[in-house]
């Protein structure tokens, strides 16, 4: 009624006055709304600096220097962490593109925001390439490329197929499995997968280091998991996917294969593929696949089974998995990452990528043989893939101590439990992988030298092991203060740097 009682001219004046009043109020309130505990120091940029257009080197030298130092560390050292790699300049271009600016909750053709024409094109292209790389029929397989990394991808699958407090079964972490496969200890549930789902681990044989499939089948029939996981993070042999399939079918479970570590080798057609036998396949995209840090979830479509009467049961995984990813666990996807994955997948379709995969395997076998020549024991006796697990227990050196010494010598690896280890807190070995250095151009003869460097580092650890104290804390304190030790490690580090510096490193030149 108020609007009807006043003229349009009067109303316009009132609204204009209100805007002035509100503007003045907001200006005053704006200075009072934020009351920090300590005064905030504001930086005034010089007139020739543009916050939105200048490069990071000019805008933020502090961050730039840290990135530059990390690049230098990667260049001068030997990256042997099995889950790491060097992605390409083209992938980095995609990660730094305008794709990072866009919000796009939902899926192609069904978004909760506008302006997604090219976002949809990119996601569809990424999905198309993902199926093509692994030789999958789009009528029988689909793929979700929105998961932010491997752990959320696995959790999304459990959420979709198992439900709260449902049962999953994966390889025990100390035996070569992964945290997301349901790891827990007697004291606590370490992973969210063991917190929200019931999990029962299967094991490897303590003597051979190989998965005990007979025991796995026996326990699966007792536990009756909803999802059986065929996946590893430190297992150097091929998985028997056909046996996994038979066990899963017998137990009434879905078979989920986690090929995060080996997906690049599967893409190159060099090792057995899990797709023939699996209902769901998950993978990260940044390990042997050599893409950005992301993940993919592949799921079957079409007919799941046919009973004795010829009645078909269809898969219903697509809706469940997509809904678990969004809106179940995530909001908007990282579109720059999806672009990077698409680029990496195109590279997977090249002959160069196959040659890279072949070299990974050659280098792994070369490193294994070199270390055995130096007298080291390897879990399972060798390797069929990109990694090997060195058992240091026979020489009396803990994995954490070897990792520390090698790190000081610019050789990056990680401590790892070995089959039969009593405590996961004091692992008896180190895990080594060849993808990263293979991406830098290392060949067999180079990995022989790498094996020699590792041997030197471990022998230094062995030399000072007894006098350096009983705990890792004591050991690190000793290595930080003993001058003779520091001199020996510095000499080794210098030779490692000189050797590593001969090889190119992919990506940006400076950072």
UniProtKB/Swiss-Prot annotation:
List this protein's GO terms for biological process. Answer: embryo development ending in birth or egg hatching; glycine biosynthetic process from serine; tetrahydrofolate interconversion; tetrahydrofolate metabolic process
Q: Which reaction does it catalyse?
A: (6R)-5,10-methylene-5,6,7,8-tetrahydrofolate + glycine + H2O = (6S)-5,6,7,8-tetrahydrofolate + L-serine
EC number(s) in its UniProt entry?
Answer: 2.1.2.1
Q: Which UniProt keywords apply?
A: One-carbon metabolism, Pyridoxal phosphate, Transferase
- UniProt enzyme class: transferase
Instruction: Kindly list the GO molecular function terms attached to this UniProt entry.
Output: glycine hydroxymethyltransferase activity; pyridoxal phosphate binding
What does the record give as cofactor?
A: pyridoxal 5'-phosphate
Q: Which HAMAP family match?
A: SHMT (MF_00051)
Could you tell me what this protein does?
A: Interconversion of serine and glycine.
Assembly description? Homotetramer.
Which family, according to UniProt? Belongs to the SHMT family.
What is this protein identified as? Serine hydroxymethyltransferase
The organism's taxonomic lineage, starting at the top: Eukaryota, Metazoa, Ecdysozoa, Nematoda, Chromadorea
Q: Which gene encodes it?
A: mel-32
